């Protein structure tokens, strides 16, 4: 044991010595340095080489002296360091004077020509600022690369995560310690603008004239300042308002796999809530498609939510899309949250925060964790998964000053809700809306699963007794229908009792009535969007449960708004069916054309089918008694169909 410890200690000392040696060999661009022992240049061999060597001897000596130099660290102040190592999105920085930045502090990497950074250097050397840069006086366009400190490795080296691509970054680049976390612009100047993780505008409309900037790392509100709300946020979407209502000032999660409609649903919520919402909204695109962010921006401009000229914009956009490095995708959520917190705390607003997609936040954290060398936990996620999620989610809260209502899209890998990423998110949410691939395959949109979706607001003391009873009855009848599906698939509808048949018919109508056309999907469906009030939804579903609409065809309940739309669609369906059925004509023996009724047409079809089968049976020698029995069976089976069609036409 003693020998092993001694050997380990020696290895540690050797590695530390190697680190120190490698650090001293890092050249810094822009600093004159003293020469050190350098290897002799190889002797020229051919006559051409000798001639070239003689002509360019002085130039080669000068370049050799500049390249093989040792850093004169006396030229650096205590807030300056140099890039020691670059490994993709991870950058190691050496601070020679021993004053290391804190964890989560922002570092700036640049060539730092005098005309760009005179103010920065002045602030760094100003004792009154205690080493902190006044970010309000640093133009963001001068910042080439921002790093965030993640680890202290020892011997003056810190390991950082880059918030942008590191292409072209080399060892020896000068690094400045800002002395604080990343600061981003906040306030009404951000409304109508698109910015990235470091607060840089990316909409081509010039700099953001913000008067204040705030750090992206902040503590959650104190427990004494919290003021939970118990009021419903009406979305105008039937399945959500009825079965999994959202709370004002709560956290809402939209769970679903790839391609089931999370982004479309979140855009419809923006359309229905943000446009009618009196306060401000913040949309944060985390690791999603740049095309969707571009489309969303132009849709908001057309809708008047964003005004390119003059004041009046209601939403701020923060994007860190899927082409960004993991550092940007992991921190852009905090940037958007910081903007929303300012509106809540400083201006007392009720803010809407949309995040698409919160899974990409977790995924970026997993990538960063692997790059930093941490041992992964279950399914390859970072060991700090719960901590990272909690630090972000706890800042989304309702206080005595204002509220933040967040709607978060959550991608579910392989449609597995037990995956650690969505499972960790579940614990922080007030309402969960689960999008089902099985329902989307039926063509029902939004494909919200009414049995898996939940809400803490489903309490009769909050939503009212009538709403609670109708919602639970709807879920009950859908659950009964789900349990009967296996029996129907094996034995068919004939083996069900009359009550079970009524349950199936009403459940299928409810299932289709939960679909709804969206305004944001008008270009794809060619159907006008519908906003349905909660009171109308309760009344309509109550009527379906009581059997008031049993006479309406099932197809009339598909992709409509309120129950009035169902009745209008049913009338159109019956009218078109009547034209096809009633206007079918036959020619009598006298040559006159007469109108054929529904019963006559069905009877004619029965006769045709019967005669075709009788012809076959006679060929095989069937008895007359057997043929009469067959006739009675045909008439019995079609009698119910004839009666139903006649009732529909009379309506």
Curated annotation (Swiss-Prot):
Its main location: mitochondrion. Gene3D superfamilies: 2.40.10.170, Bovine Mitochondrial F1-atpase, Atp Synthase Beta Chain, Chain D, domain 3, P-loop containing nucleotide triphosphate hydrolases. ADP binds at residues 259-264. SMART domains: AAA (SM00382). Pfam families: ATP-synt_ab, ATP-synt_ab_N, ATP-synt_VA_C. Mg(2+) 1 binds at residue 263. Mg(2+) 2 binds at residue 288. Keywords: ATP synthesis, ATP-binding, CF(1), Hydrogen ion transport, Ion transport, Magnesium, Membrane, Metal-binding, Mitochondrion, Mitochondrion inner membrane, Nucleotide-binding, Transit peptide, Translocase, Transport. It catalyses: ATP + H2O + 4 H(+)(in) = ADP + phosphate + 5 H(+)(out). ATP binds at residues 259, 261-264, 289. It is found in: Mitochondrion inner membrane. InterPro entries: AAA+_ATPase (IPR003593), ATP-synt_VA_C (IPR055190), ATP_synth_F1_bsu (IPR005722), ATPase_alpha/beta_chains (IPR050053), ATPase_F1/V1/A1_a/bsu_N (IPR004100), ATPase_F1/V1/A1_a/bsu_N_sf (IPR036121), ATPase_F1/V1/A1_a/bsu_nucl-bd (IPR000194), ATPase_F1/V1_b/a_C (IPR024034). GO terms for biological process: proton motive force-driven ATP synthesis; proton motive force-driven mitochondrial ATP synthesis; response to mercury ion. It is a peripheral membrane protein. The keyword Cell division does not apply. The keyword Flavoprotein does not apply. GO terms for molecular function: ATP binding; ATP hydrolysis activity; proton-transporting ATP synthase activity, rotational mechanism. Phosphate binds at residues 259-263. One of its GO terms (cellular component) is mitochondrial inner membrane. Residues 1-30 form a transit peptide. Homotrimer. Component of the ATP synthase complex composed at least of ATP5F1A/subunit alpha, ATP5F1B/subunit beta, ATP5MC1/subunit c (homooctomer), MT-ATP6/subunit a, MT-ATP8/subunit 8, ATP5ME/subunit e, ATP5MF/subunit f, ATP5MG/subunit g, ATP5MK/subunit k, ATP5MJ/subunit j, ATP5F1C/subunit gamma, ATP5F1D/subunit delta, ATP5F1E/subunit epsilon, ATP5PF/subunit F6, ATP5PB/subunit b, ATP5PD/subunit d, ATP5PO/subunit OSCP. PANTHER family: ATP SYNTHASE, ATP SYNTHASE SUBUNIT BETA, MITOCHONDRIAL. Belongs to the ATPase alpha/beta chains family. This is ATP synthase F(1) complex catalytic subunit beta, mitochondrial. The gene is atp5f1b.
């Amino acid at each position: 044991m003693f020998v092993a410890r001694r050997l380990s200690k020696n290895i540690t000392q050797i590695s530390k010595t190697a680190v120190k040696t490698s650090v001293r060999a890092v050249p810094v661009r822009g600093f004159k340095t003293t020469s050190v022992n350098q290897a002799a240049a190889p002797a020229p061999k051919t006559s051409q080489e000798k001639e070239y060597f003689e002509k360019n001897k002085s130039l080669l000596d000068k370049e050799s002296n500049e390249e093989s130099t040792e850093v004169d660290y006396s030229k650096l102040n205590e807030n300056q360091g140099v890039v020691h190592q670059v490994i993709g999105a991870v950058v190691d920085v050496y601070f020679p004077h021993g004053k290391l930045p804190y964890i989560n502090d922002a570092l700036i990497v640049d060539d730092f020509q005098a005309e760009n950074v005179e103010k920065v250097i002045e602030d760094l050397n100003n004792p009154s600022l205690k080493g902190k840069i006044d970010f309000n006086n640093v133009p963001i366009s001068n910042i080439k690369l921002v790093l965030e400190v993640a680890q202290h490795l020892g011997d003056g080296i810190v390991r950082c995560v880059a918030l942008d691509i590191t292409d072209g970054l080399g060892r020896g680049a000068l690094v400045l310690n800002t002395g604080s976390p990343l600061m981003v612009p906040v306030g009404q100047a951000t409304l109508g603008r698109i910015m990235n993780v470091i607060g840089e505008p990316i909409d081509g409309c010039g700099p953001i004239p913000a008067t204040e900037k705030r750090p992206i790392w902040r503590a959650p509100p104190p427990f004494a300042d919290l003021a939970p709300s118990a009021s419903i946020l009406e979305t105008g979407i039937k399945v959500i308002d009825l079965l999994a209502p959202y709370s004002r000032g709560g956290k809402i999660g939209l769970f679903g796999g790839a391609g089931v409609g999370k982004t479309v649903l979140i855009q419809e919520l923006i359309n229905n809530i943000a446009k009618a919402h009196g306060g401000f909204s913040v949309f944060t695109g985390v690791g999603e498609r740049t095309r969707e962010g571009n489309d969303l921006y132009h849709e908001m401009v057309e809708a008047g939510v964003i005004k390119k000229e003059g004041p009046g914009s209601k939403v701020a956009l923060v994007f860190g899309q899927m082409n960004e490095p993991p550092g940007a995708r992991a921190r852009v959520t905090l940037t958007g949250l910081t903007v929303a917190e300012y509106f809540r705390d400083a201006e007392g607003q009720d803010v809407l925060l949309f995040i698409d997609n919160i899974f990409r936040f977790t995924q970026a954290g997993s990538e960063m964790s692997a790059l930093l060398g941490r041992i992964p936990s279950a399914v390859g996620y970072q060991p700090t998964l719960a901590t990272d999620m909690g630090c972000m989610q706890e800042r989304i809260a309702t206080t005595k000053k204002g509220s933040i209502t967040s709607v978060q899209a959550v991608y579910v890998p392989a449609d597995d809700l037990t995956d650690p990423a969505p499972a960790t998110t579940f614990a922080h949410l007030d309402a969960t809306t689960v999008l089902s691939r099985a329902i989307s395959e039926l063509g029902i949109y939004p494909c919200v699963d009414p049995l898996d979706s939940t809400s803490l607001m489903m309490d009769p003391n909050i939503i009212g007794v009538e709403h609670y009873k109708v919602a639970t009855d709807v879920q009950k009848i859908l659950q009964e229908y789900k349990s009967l599906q296996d029996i129907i698939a094996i034995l068919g509808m004939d083996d069900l009792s009359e009550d079970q048949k009524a349950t199936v018919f009403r459940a299928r109508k409810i299932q289709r009535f939960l679909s709804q056309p969206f305004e944001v999907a008008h270009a794809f469906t060619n159907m006008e969007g519908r906003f349905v009030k909660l009171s109308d939804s309760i009344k309509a579903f109550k009527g379906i449960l009581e059997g008031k609409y049993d006479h309406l065809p099932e197809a009339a309940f598909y992709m409509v708004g309120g129950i009035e739309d169902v009745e209008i669609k049913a009338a159109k369906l019956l009218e078109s069916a009547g034209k096809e059925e009633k206007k079918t004509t036959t020619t009598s023996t006298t040559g006159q054309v007469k109108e054929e009724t529904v019963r006559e047409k069905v009877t004619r079809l029965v006769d045709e089918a019967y005669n075709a089968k009788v012809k076959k049976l006679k060929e095989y020698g069937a008895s007359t008694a057997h043929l009469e029995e067959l006739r009675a069976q045909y008439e019995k089976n079609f009698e119910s169909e004839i009666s139903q069609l006649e009732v529909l036409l009379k309506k």
